[in-house]
């Protein structure tokens, strides 16, 4: 069984919708980390640099769900709109601590059309 890490860096106002959409597309869980950062066009106010708040959402997903999750979130949450966020996926070489999830995944694989 192969897994990917899907990471979404999004406006905190989109977090709930991103999680709901990702779960609807096959994600089984998430981790949300509060963060801040700047984009390509830095924000300034009275000469001071302003860092935007962002949520970093992590999803460990089955490899075959990665594209569906990313496409669904990108479309439903308008990730391509400026300021909404970005998404990336990374290969996971090794994983532990997912025995309950793997059991559920195996059950789901019996009924899924790949």
Identify the meaning behind each predicted range.
Residues 1-114:
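Positively charged, small/polar-rich N-terminal and surface patches that mediate targeting and assembly
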């Amino acid at each position: 069984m192969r897994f990917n890490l899907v990471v979404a860096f999004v406006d905190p106002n989109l977090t709930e919708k991103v999680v709901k959409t990702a779960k609807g597309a096959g994600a089984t869980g998430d981790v949300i980390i509060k963060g801040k950062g700047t984009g390509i066009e830095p924000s300034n106010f009275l000469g001071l640099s302003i860092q935007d708040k962002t949520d970093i959402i992590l999803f460990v997903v089955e490899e075959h769900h990665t594209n569906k999750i990313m496409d669904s979130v990108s479309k439903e949450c308008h990730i391509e709109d400026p300021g909404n966020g970005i998404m990336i996926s990374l290969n996971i070489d090794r994983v532990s601590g997912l025995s309950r999830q793997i059991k559920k995944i195996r059950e789901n694989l019996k009924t899924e059309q790949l």
